[in-house]
């Protein structure tokens, strides 16, 4: 099964470069540039429009829509819901990144409102955010997962991912030291990445943007999420090796470089994928 998954990941890497999907990303001003750059790096075409009077139209002609709650406001929530509904109407996949869910009441209410009005195809977050969305008690550290949540075993995280995937009828990606991806039936653990990724603002947001790029070129959103998270994790490892002893700026640049150079040989040499039978 793992070889089959990796074959599909490799094909999708090629397809996204051939199709150049338009990815409509409503994200935050902290990470917008990096999100746009990683979409470009894998072969997609980003648009970052968030004005309420144009998001419906742009979402309707896009290949994927990414909704990111990094910086939230009444106007941003309205734009996200309008874009999401337009995407649903036009069979465009929607990726949701509930940044900081569980931190504050307005953010929590916003996440719940988006989920109640928009059909989500992929939801990506850390374990604390996903536990909150799943209706479980969770602790957060700003927009980061709490230490107690991060210390949950992979088996328990997989149960959370699978249950939420069934509940929302979508793909769930929990990212962390190990990444858990589930569509409610298929479940995998991805063990790539490097701790330096946590020291760069927005690598989670970039992962969600990559989910949009790959979902925009595929009907299998489980494989799209795997492709996105593997690309980020492996690129983090490569970037660390290239920037070791130099500094964070070089790591950041090397990360984008590695994403842009991802290919079949790198995937098949470095991917660490484990299936979970549940």
UniProtKB/Swiss-Prot annotation:
Q: What is its EC number?
A: 2.7.1.50
Keywords, A to Z, come to: ATP-binding, Kinase, Magnesium, Metal-binding, Nucleotide-binding, Thiamine biosynthesis, Transferase
Q: Look up the coiled coil feature and give its residue ranges.
A: none
Q: Is Kinase found in the keyword set?
A: yes
Q: GO molecular function terms here?
A: ATP binding; hydroxyethylthiazole kinase activity; magnesium ion binding
Task: Specify the pathway.
Answer: Cofactor biosynthesis; thiamine diphosphate biosynthesis; 4-methyl-5-(2-phosphoethyl)-thiazole from 5-(2-hydroxyethyl)-4-methylthiazole: step 1/1
Q: Which InterPro entries match?
A: Hyethyz_kinase, Ribokinase-like
- Which GO terms of type biological process are on file? thiamine biosynthetic process; thiamine diphosphate biosynthetic process
Catalysed transformations (reactions): 5-(2-hydroxyethyl)-4-methylthiazole + ATP = 4-methyl-5-(2-phosphooxyethyl)-thiazole + ADP + H(+)
Binding-site residues, substrate = 48, 202
Q: Per UniProt, where does ATP bind?
A: 124, 175
Taken from the record, one Pfam family name reads HK
Keyword Transmembrane helix listed: no
Family matches, as Gene3D superfamilies: 3.40.1190.20
Names of required cofactors = Mg(2+)
Q: What does the record give as the function of this protein?
A: Catalyzes the phosphorylation of the hydroxyl group of 4-methyl-5-beta-hydroxyethylthiazole (THZ).
The similarity annotation says: Belongs to the Thz kinase family.
Query: What's the name of the protein?
Result: Hydroxyethylthiazole kinase
The gene is: thiM
């Amino acid at each position: 099964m793992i070889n089959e998954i990796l074959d599909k990941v490799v094909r999708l890497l090629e397809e996204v470069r051939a199709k150049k999907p338009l990815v409509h990303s409503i994200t935050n001003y902290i990470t917008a540039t990096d999100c746009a750059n990683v979409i470009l790096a894998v072969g997609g075409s980003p648009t970052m429009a968030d004005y309420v009077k144009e998001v419906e139209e742009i979402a309707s002609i896009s290949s994927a829509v990414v909704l990111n709650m990094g910086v939230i406001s009444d106007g941003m929530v309205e734009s996200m819901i309008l874009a999401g509904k337009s995407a649903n109407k036009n069979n465009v996949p929607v990726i949701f990144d509930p940044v900081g869910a569980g931190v504050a009441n307005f953010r929590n209410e916003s996440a719940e409102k988006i989920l109640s009005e928009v059909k989500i195809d992929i939801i990506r977050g850390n374990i604390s955010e996903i536990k909150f969305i799943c209706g479980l008690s969770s602790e957060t550290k700003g927009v980061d997962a709490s230490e107690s949540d991060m210390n949950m075993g992979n088996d328990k995280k997989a149960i959370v991912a699978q249950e939420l995937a069934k509940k929302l009828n979508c793909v769930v990606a929990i990212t962390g030291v190990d990444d858990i991806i589930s569509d409610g039936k298929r479940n995998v653990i991805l063990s790539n990445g490097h701790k330096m990724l946590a020291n760069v603002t927005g690598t989670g947001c970039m992962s969600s943007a990559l989910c949009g790029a790959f979902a925009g070129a595929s009907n299998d959103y489980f494989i799209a999420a795997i492709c996105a998270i593997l690309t980020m994790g492996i690129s983090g490892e490569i970037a660390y090796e290239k920037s070791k002893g130099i500094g964070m700026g070089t790591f950041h640049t090397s990360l984008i470089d590695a994403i842009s150079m991802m290919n079949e040989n790198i995937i098949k040499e470095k991917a660490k994928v484990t299936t979970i039978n549940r």
